């Protein structure tokens, strides 16, 4: 930190007193100088400029010594200055090890570094810096004008040489260039720049709108193409399902015919009843196993179809996310289209699942009906056999009854096993479907949650950008107001000059018109469409007879 004025004066007086008390030395050079700051500033040991000792207060030191059990008078030394007599404590070893000695400069540096400026203080400092800079620029400009006026008077009163003529010509060129740059700062030319910039912005905006429309058409065409692909895939899936149902119906019809033929065969061949029953059981087991295998294959096919649809939906979502990332600044409707498309896909998938569930239930009902018919036929056949056996065989052998009982017991056990196996299959299917539905629901919620987080993130970014644009607009308005105030003050200051400035204003207008025409020519030279150039010419109020075609 820099030293205070009092400290510098005190250091200087102390240094002079010490120099008078010291013996004189032989002078080597009268003009030699020594930078005393290299050896450190010499200052009296006042209370404010002395090294800062934490816990240096006498009362605090006494309390500390009392707490440590060392309550005795410390060793001191007397320091006599011109204005006071001070008694300094000779520092000893710190028992606590927590004391710290630092210089005032270091303490002030740490205190200054620990201070955090607020936003208002930063703005105030920036405003003060701008005002100071503007004042310096005004002072320098005024000084330059005075020096130029004096130089012009001096040059007009003397004859110029060839080199001076060349220098004068260069100076005039520089002055002309400076006047041109100054004219660039005029309000009319600023408005002209704004008009040209506005024309360029309109041209760029129209091009962007056209590009946006083309992109929207491409997106619509792509969406229609995807819808057509999904419709074709759906029709193919429906055809495959219809073909599969047709084959299953034919197979069930063949099974029914086989059962009817088997029943007729049983009626014709009563002597082989036991063997035929065993064959029927084996055929029924094979048929049930075949149905189970068909159910498993059907479940696997539905699972594969579902995985394909999910992969297709994921691919479409990834494609939409990529397009959304590329057109984030221009296309906000893309996200809504993706969400609607995803909802439609989910609705179609739900309809497909409902249709598959309905088909499965109808198939189970058909199987249950066939089993009921078979059991009914078997029961009826058993009753007929029993009546016929009762009529034809009055004397029944116990061994035959025992065998019949064993056969009936085996039949019941087999049917019980079949029912148990069927129930286990039904429970397994229901569990598998429930797990798959839960997974689909979790995946849908995850995608929906990610989309909501992305929408919230975009909304926050948009709000941040809007805040930045608002601050920038406020800053521009403030600068415009300051410029307007400066222009008003300049006009008030130049109003008293009267007629002399009238001709200058006329010349200034002519120069401004020339500069406007040149800028308009430069605008046309850039290749901007003629309608924007004509609109810029109309806003700039350039007369038609003087405009450049």
From Swiss-Prot:
Keyword match Translocase: no
GO cellular component, one term: axonemal microtubule
Region (Disordered): 1-27, 391-416
Domain of life, per lineage: Eukaryota
Cell compartment(s), UniProt: Cytoplasm, Cytoskeleton, Cilium axoneme; Cytoplasm, Cytoskeleton, Flagellum axoneme; Cell projection, Cilium; Cell projection, Cilium, Flagellum
Molecular functions (GO terms): AMP binding
This protein's name: Cilia- and flagella-associated protein 45
Organism of derivation: Bos taurus (Bovine)
């Amino acid at each position: 930190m820099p030293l205070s004025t009092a400290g510098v004066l005190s250091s200087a007086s102390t240094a002079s007193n010490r120099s008078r008390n010291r013996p004189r030395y032989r002078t080597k050079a009268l003009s030699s100088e020594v930078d005393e700051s290299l050896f450190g500033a010499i200052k009296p040991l006042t209370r404010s400029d002395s090294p800062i000792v934490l816990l240096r207060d006498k009362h605090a030191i006494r309390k500390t010594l009392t707490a440590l059990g060392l309550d005795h008078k410390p060793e001191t030394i007397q320091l006599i200055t011109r204005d006071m007599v001070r008694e300094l404590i000779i520092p000893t070893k710190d028992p606590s090890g927590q004391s710290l000695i630092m210089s005032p400069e270091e303490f002030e540096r740490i205190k200054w570094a620990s201070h955090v400026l607020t936003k208002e203080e930063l703005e105030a400092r920036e405003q003060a810096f701008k005002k100071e800079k503007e004042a310096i620029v005004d002072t320098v400009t005024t000084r330059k004008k005075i020096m130029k006026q004096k130089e012009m008077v001096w040059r007009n009163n003397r004859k110029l040489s060839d080199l001076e003529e060349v220098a004068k010509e260069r100076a005039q060129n520089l002055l002309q260039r400076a006047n041109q740059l100054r004219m660039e700062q005029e309000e009319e030319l600023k408005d002209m720049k704004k008009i040209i910039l506005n024309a360029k912005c309109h041209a760029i905006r129209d091009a962007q709108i056209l590009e946006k429309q083309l992109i929207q058409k491409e997106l619509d065409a792509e969406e229609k193409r995807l819808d057509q692909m999904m419709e074709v895939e759906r029709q193919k899936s429906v055809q495959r399902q219809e073909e599969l149902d047709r084959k299953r119906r034919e197979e069930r019809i063949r099974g029914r015919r086989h059962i009817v033929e088997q029943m007729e065969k049983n009626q014709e061949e009563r002597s082989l009843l036991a063997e035929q029953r065993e064959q029927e059981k084996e055929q029924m087991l094979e048929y049930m196993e075949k149905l189970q295998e068909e159910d498993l294959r059907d479940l696997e096919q539905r699972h594969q179809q579902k995985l394909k649809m999910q992969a297709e939906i994921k691919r479409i979502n990834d494609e939409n996310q990529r397009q959304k990332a590329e057109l984030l600044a221009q296309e906000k409707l893309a996200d809504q289209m993706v969400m609607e498309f995803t909802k439609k896909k989910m609705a179609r998938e739900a309809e497909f699942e409902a249709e598959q569930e309905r088909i499965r239930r109808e198939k189970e009902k058909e199987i249950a009906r066939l089993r009921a018919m078979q059991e009914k036929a078997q029961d009826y056949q058993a009753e007929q056999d029993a009546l016929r056996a009762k009529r034809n065989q009055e004397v029944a052998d116990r061994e035959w009854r025992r065998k019949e009982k064993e056969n009936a017991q085996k039949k019941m056990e087999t049917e019980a096993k079949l029912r148990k196996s069927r129930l286990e299959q039904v429970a397994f299917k229901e569990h598998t479907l429930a797990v798959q539905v839960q997974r689909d629901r979790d995946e849908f919620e995850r995608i929906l949650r990610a989309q909501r987080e992305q929408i919230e993130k975009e909304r926050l970014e948009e709000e941040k950008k809007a805040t930045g644009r608002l601050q920038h607009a406020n800053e521009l308005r403030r600068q415009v107001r300051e410029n307007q105030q400066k222009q008003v003050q300049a006009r008030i200051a130049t109003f008293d000059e009267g007629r002399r400035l009238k001709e200058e204003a006329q010349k200034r207008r002519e120069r401004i018109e020339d500069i406007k025409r040149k800028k308009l020519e430069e605008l046309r030279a850039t290749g901007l469409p003629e309608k924007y150039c004509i609109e810029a010419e109309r806003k700039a109020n350039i007369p038609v007879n003087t405009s450049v075609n």
